[in-house]
Amino acid sequence: MRKLTSFTFVALTALAVSACSNSSKEIEQGTEQELYAKGQTYLQDGDYSQAVRYLEAVKNRFPAANYSEQTQLDLIYAYYKSQDYTKTLVAAERFLQQYPNSPNVDYVIYMAGLTNFASGENFFQDFFGVDRATRENTAMKAAFANFQTLVDHFPNSTYAQDALARMAYIKAALARHELAIAKFYMKRNAYVAVANRVVGMLQQYPDTQATLEALPLMKEAYEKMNLPDLAKQTETLIQANKDKKFSDVEKPKDVELNKPKA
């Protein structure tokens, strides 16, 4: 039985090596049309890692060919679906530089936003419950900037409505993040840092529940620093907003992405 198992393993390994060898040969020698068609087949099958192999071969071997723009769009999609966010952003930036007048610019900006959004979500999941309050979520801020660019320059885009919803969610999430940092500093008696954080929240995220909840922290920080006038001003602000409550902003549902045509 052991011999049979061993022979079976050797046979399967040989098949895998043979298939890999054939695939590599195909990528090295295939025509532009053959490689692109193969990449499309893998995309449709949801085998994004294989799709990337063939599409990258098209891009690298035939950089000025007929499929160049479409290949780059497909790669952005395949990288994103593979959760290779670094390559997604690099590909998106390259596309915007090479095809600034493409009718798919809004799609590429949107994909950059989704990519940064996904990276930022990973950060938040890692952050809350873990003592890492001094870290900044640059990915979520980048996502907000991407979506802002999209709605400013392409207000009628198919992706504008979802971008707006994600901006609202990001704003609320970043405000909660700032509140967590303010609490972190308060526990360490870093009162100047607390006050500065909440002032920043008032400037950047005034219409969020987290900012309202941060006001008492700012008041306490001023009191601890023996700044009664600022503490009194903060109390006035608290009283002016005591009946106000902002509704929770739900995370937008994942969208059904379709590959655009160049």
Where are these regions (language model features)?
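Conserved glycine-rich beta-strand-loop-beta hairpin in the small C-terminal domain of fold type I
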Residues: F9
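Acidic, polar-rich low-complexity tracts and alpha-helical solenoid repeat scaffolds
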Residues: R2-S6, A16-A262
